Amino acid sequence: MKFEDYQRFTFRRDGRILVCSFSGNAVNAVDARMHDELAELFVDLQHDEDSDLIVLTGENRAFCAGGDFDWFDEQINDPRKFRAIAYDAKRIVSGLLDLEKPIIARLNGAAAGLGATIALLCDVIIADEAAKIGDPHVKVGLVAGDGGAIIWPQLIGFARAKELLMTGDLLSATEAARMGLINYAVPTDQLDAKVAEIAGKILGNPRWAVRWTKMTANITLKQIMVSTSDAAVAYETLSNMTADRKEAVAAFRERRPMNLTGE
């Protein structure tokens, strides 16, 4: 795997474990470069011959806090830039679901928007109990078309998922674990030990039994993705062109209530 090709991720090996870390700004917000790299990342991880398990985590104070607001402004001012990422948005989700190697999400901090989607598409999610997780697409005027509307209902049911997706509320890691959205929420000083424990248990089993069990479990998710992702991305693309989308981003930047018109 050519680590040097990546600017928004860092990599570290621990035996047969490859630790892959978001490494952007202070909250690892997704910009154009990171989005491009995400579309390639999981394919490259699949072909890395020196790893059997991936740990995905974040540097700085967040796991991945969703979209970068400067990038949002670019997409609002030139909707062609949003349309241009539609194909890669689907590749990110399919890349995760097609990755045969088990992948553990180590939530060291906030996972929001696309960051939450990526975490929830991982096989095991272990969070610092101080972390927050949620999908606030609606709070910035967007449909959760990047996979959020696909994976949340599968994990916690449609009623809870739609409430959280339509309010954009964030959950504490403890609450997320309680409702089954993630696997574990642990104290900060126990996070690495818990990740190592689960990784060790997985790696203690025959490689191909583990990989193909994961692939079998992912069949239904892949069928759902194929049947819904085109519409989900199309709805998100349309929402980027609304007046309320522009207002929502401006209000967030200016730390004021939104003045929504329904347009």
Each predicted region: which residue ranges?
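Crotonase-fold acyl-CoA enzyme core
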Residues: 94-210, 233, 237, 241-242, ...
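Glycine- (often His-adjacent) and acidic-residue-rich active-site loop
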Residues: 3, 58-95, 111, 141, ...
